[in-house]
Amino acid sequence: MQLTYFLFQVAVALLAIVTYILHRKLTYFKRRGIPYDKPHPLRGNMEGYKKTRTVHEIHQEYYNKYRNSKAPFVGFYLFQKPAAFVIDLELAKQILIKNFSNFTDKGIYYNEKDDPMSAHLFNLDGPQWRLLRSKLSSTFTSGKMKFMYPTVVSVAEEFMAVMHEKVSENSILDVRDLVARFTVDVIGTCAFGIKCNSLRDEKAEFLHFGRRALLDSRHGNLVSGLMRSYPNLARRLGLCRNTAQIQEFYQRIVKETVTLREKENIKRNDFMDMLIGLKNQKNMTLENGEVVKGLTMDEIVAQAFVFFIAGFDTSSSTMGFALYELAKNPSIQDKVRAELGQVLEQHDQKFTYECIKDLKYLDQVINETLRHYTIVPNVDRVAAKRFVVPGNPKFVIEAGQSVIIPSSAIHHDPSIYPEPNEFRPERFSPEESAKRPSVAWLPFGEGPRNCIGLRFGQMQARIGLAMLIKNFTFSPCSATPDPLTFDPHSAILLGIKGGIQLKVEAI
C-alpha cells in the first residue's frame, strides 16, 4: 500500500513537472510581449501538418497575417519549440550574413550514433559542420563542375533518346516522372558511379529507394515533433530519421562502390571520386591552415546520401515545374528556344559548358520557377548567443532559440514580387534583381551556409531543360492539372498530387 502511494506521488510530481515545462514553453512569447498565435499543446502552430496543409501553406498564412505588423519577427511554435518567425528582410540579412557567426547552426535533428546517415552536411551543427564544410568545399568548385559536365551531358543525351521513343508512342507524357528519372540517373552516375538505368526501367532500384527516402517516414507526427522539440532526449532514446531499409541500401551501395574503386584503382571525374580522395588523405590542410584527418566511411555514406536525395528531388521538381509553366506560357517557351538557337549557333551547335552558361534567359526561367515553386519552404537557424534586434530592443532572440526564415512566404510577398502568383522570368533580369536585397530570394539559402551543391543542381537543370526545349515543344492537354494540387503528406519539400501531364511533340 505504501509503495503504491509512493508511486502515485512520484507520478503526480512528474506530471506537475512536465506540465510546468510545457506551460513555460507555450507561454514563451506571451511573457516577452512578442506577437504570436496561441499554440496547440502538441502541434504548436503546425495545425494540419502532413494532413491538410503543406509547410508552405502554414508559413504563408502566418506570414500574411503578420507581414504588416512592423515586428521584425513574431513568435511561432514548431510543435512545442518556440521559434522566431522572421518577417523583416533586414533581420534575415543580419542572421544569414552580417551576424552569421552567431547563427551558424540549423537545429535540425540528427543522430550520429544510431543513424550516421543523418549526420550529413545539411544537418550538422557547430564545429562538426565547420570541419565537414571545409573538407567538402573543394568538391563543388566551378572547376569540379566542369569535370562532371560531360557525364551529365551523356545522361541528358540518353534522356533525349528515351523521350523521342516515348513521344512516338504517345504524345501525352508525365514530365514530372520523366525528369525525376533523368535526375536519378545523373546523380547516381555522379555520386555513386553507377548506371542506374532509371530512364528505361521504371522499377530501377535507385529510383525506388530515392522515392522511399523522401516518402517513407519512420515515425508519426508525435515522435517527429518530439525529435524537433526535444532533440537531446530523442538522441538518448536512439530515435532515427531514416528507416532501416533506407540505411541498409545506401550503406551497401556506397561501401561496395568505394571497395571496388580502390581495389581496381578506378578513377572518374565524379563526386564519389572526390570523396574517396578525401578519405585517403591521412592529413589534409583546411583553408584556415588547420590540419585534420580525411573523411571516414560513415561520413562518405552520409554525404553521398544527402547529395543524392537533395539533388534528386529539388532538381527534378524544379525541372517539372518549369516545363509546366513553359507549357502554359508559350511565348516564354518560344523566347527560351530562340535564345537557345542563338547561343548554340555561337558554339557550333554543341552543348558545351560555356554554351550552357550563356543561356541567361533560361536562368531567369529557372530562378522564377524556384521563386514561384520554392521546394524547401524555409531556412532554419539557431542563435548561439543572445541577439538583440538592432533598433528593436524589445525583440530579443535568446541563446539556443530557433529561427525560421520563411523563404516560400517571402517569395510570394506582393510588396517584393508584385502579382506573385504570375509567372514572370523578367523579375530576374539583372536590372530587376538589383532592385531587391539578396535575401528576397532564398531557394538555396544565403550567406556562408548556403547550399553547397547549388552549382551542380543548377547545371543539371540547365542541361536537362535546354536539351528538352531544343528537341520538343510542350503544351497543356486535357489531363494537365490546373491549378496544381500540392500534397500535404510530402512533409517538408513541395510535392504535388499526381503527376504533370503535358502534350509533348518532337521538333
UniProtKB/Swiss-Prot annotation:
Superkingdom, natural source: Eukaryota
Keywords carried by this UniProt record: Endoplasmic reticulum, Heme, Iron, Membrane, Metal-binding, Microsome, Monooxygenase, Oxidoreductase
Gene3D superfamilies, per the entry: Cytochrome P450
GO CC entries: endoplasmic reticulum membrane
Membrane topology listed for this record: Peripheral membrane protein
EC supergroup of this enzyme: oxidoreductase
EC code: 1.14.-.-
PROSITE patterns, per the entry: CYTOCHROME_P450
Binding-site residues, heme: 451
Compartments, record wording: Endoplasmic reticulum membrane; Microsome membrane
Database matches in Pfam families: p450 (PF00067)
Cofactor(s) the protein needs: heme
GO molecular function, one term: iron ion binding
SUPFAM superfamilies: Cytochrome P450
UniProt family annotation: Belongs to the cytochrome P450 family.
Function as written in the Swiss-Prot or TrEMBL entry: May be involved in the metabolism of insect hormones and in the breakdown of synthetic insecticides.
Listed name of the protein: Probable cytochrome P450 6a18
The organism of origin for this protein: Drosophila melanogaster
Organism taxonomic ancestry: Eukaryota, Metazoa, Ecdysozoa, Arthropoda, Hexapoda
